[in-house]
């Protein structure tokens, strides 16, 4: 049985481990391949190169899962929306402002998404059988907020003002993205993804009413639509920064796995693991420190989550400046803990 699936099947003696952004800029072998293609989106659609970098962290570290190398913005890009990535700036998008802007969105995605599915098929063929393959998409609110802001990592005043003042239009855009996201995930599962993940990076900026309408409801719709076709495919949801609303999310969304950020108390993770598989939540900055600190912080998580339904991961993506030897040490430490499975320190 695939290692990462074990907790989902009631076998929680193992501690599956993988990292968000495990294929990325902290790896020298990734940088070498990335330098061969100037445009980031072209790199995401390059079947050979995206396959290679997806497999790099598996070959180097032996993670229990590979996550396909792609980006949450390939979906709007494939639907005809203007998306570009500027070096040292990040994503720049055409800004969605009015009903007129729907004319720039296509009903059916173009050939670009087929490249993503080809990458999944190719990785699947090359991936060792015990390793799970994770496909993913951005959750509708996060993708929508990029389109409304025209860029990422803002204070989201533009997005929130838009949904307050243009509720009907905002719901129309949300529903469109929700439908296309579900289709994208279904196609990834058809192509060979064992597990699917929804990244809602900006869910934490919303108040409860908007969180319910723009995070909980579309996530439910997506999961129910995917499960109609692939009822046994586990789905991970990551409503990052949800805070107290994580509990509402767990109660109302039929997820298999809840990914949590580093701000969530371990006591809450343990409590929630009786209801759902919990994934997380080491602070990525810990991996910038030293082995003693890494061991201390990791041990605390492992001890609290011992015997629970748990997948070890970070609270967010691995940072580009992370030393590769620290990643190796952390993985070895988790494996050693798993072997000993005792309360002793080591």
From Swiss-Prot:
It is found in: Cytoplasm. Keywords: Cytoplasm, Decarboxylase, Lyase, Porphyrin biosynthesis. Disulfide bonds: none annotated. It comes from Rickettsia africae (strain ESF-5). InterPro entries: UROD/MetE-like_sf (IPR038071), Uroporphyrinogen_deCO2ase_HemE (IPR006361), Uroporphyrinogen_deCOase (IPR000257). Pathway: Porphyrin-containing compound metabolism; protoporphyrin-IX biosynthesis; coproporphyrinogen-III from 5-aminolevulinate: step 4/4. It catalyses: uroporphyrinogen III + 4 H(+) = coproporphyrinogen III + 4 CO2. Belongs to the uroporphyrinogen decarboxylase family. Pfam families: URO-D (PF01208). One of its GO terms (biological process) is protoporphyrinogen IX biosynthetic process. Homodimer. HAMAP family: URO_D (MF_00218). Its main location: cytoplasm. It is an enzyme of class 4 (lyase). GO terms for cellular component: cytosol. Substrate binds at residues 21-25, 71, 146, 201, 316. The record marks 71 as: Transition state stabilizer. GO terms for molecular function: uroporphyrinogen decarboxylase activity. Gene3D superfamilies: 3.20.20.210. This is Uroporphyrinogen decarboxylase. Its EC number is 4.1.1.37.
């Amino acid at each position: 049985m695939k290692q990462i699936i074990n907790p989902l099947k009631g076998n929680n003696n193992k501690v599956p481990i993988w990292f968000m952004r495990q294929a990325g800029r902290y790896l020298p072998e990734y940088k070498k391949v990335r330098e061969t293609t100037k445009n980031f989106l072209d790199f995401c659609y390059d079947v050979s190169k995206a396959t290679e970098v997806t497999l790099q962290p598996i070959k180097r570290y032996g993670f229990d899962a590979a996550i396909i190398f792609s980006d949450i913005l390939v979906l709007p890009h494939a639907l005809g929306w203007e998306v570009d990535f500027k070096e040292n700036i990040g994503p720049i998008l055409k800004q969605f402002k009015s009903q007129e802007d729907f004319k720039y969105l296509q009903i059916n995605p173009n050939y670009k998404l087929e490249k993503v599915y080809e990458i999944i098929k190719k990785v699947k063929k090359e991936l060792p059988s015990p390793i799970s393959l994770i496909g993913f998409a951005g959750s509708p609110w996060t993708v929508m907020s990029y389109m409304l802001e025209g860029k990422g990592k803002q204070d989201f005043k533009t997005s929130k003002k838009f949904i307050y003042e243009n509720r009907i239009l905002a719901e129309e855009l949300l529903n469109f993205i929700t439908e296309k996201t579900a289709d994208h995930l279904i196609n990834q599962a058809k192509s060979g993804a064992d597990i699917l993940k929804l990244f809602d990076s900006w869910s934490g900026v919303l108040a409860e009413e908007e969180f319910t309408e723009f995070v909980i409801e579309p996530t439910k719709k997506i999961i129910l639509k995917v499960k109609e076709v692939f009822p046994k495919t586990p789905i991970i949801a990551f409503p990052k920064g949800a805070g107290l609303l994580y509990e509402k999310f767990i109660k109302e969304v039929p997820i298999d796995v809840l990914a949590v950020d580093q701000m969530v108390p371990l006591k809450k993770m343990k409590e929630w693991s009786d209801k759902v598989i919990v994934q997380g939540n080491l602070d990525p900055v810990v991996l910038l420190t030293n082995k003693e600190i890494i061991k201390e912080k990791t041990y605390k998580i492992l001890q609290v989550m011992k015997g629970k339904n748990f997948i070890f991961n970070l609270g967010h993506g691995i940072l580009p400046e992370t030393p590769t030897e620290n990643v190796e040490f952390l993985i070895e430490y988790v494996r050693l803990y798993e072997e000993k499975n005792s309360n002793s320190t080591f």
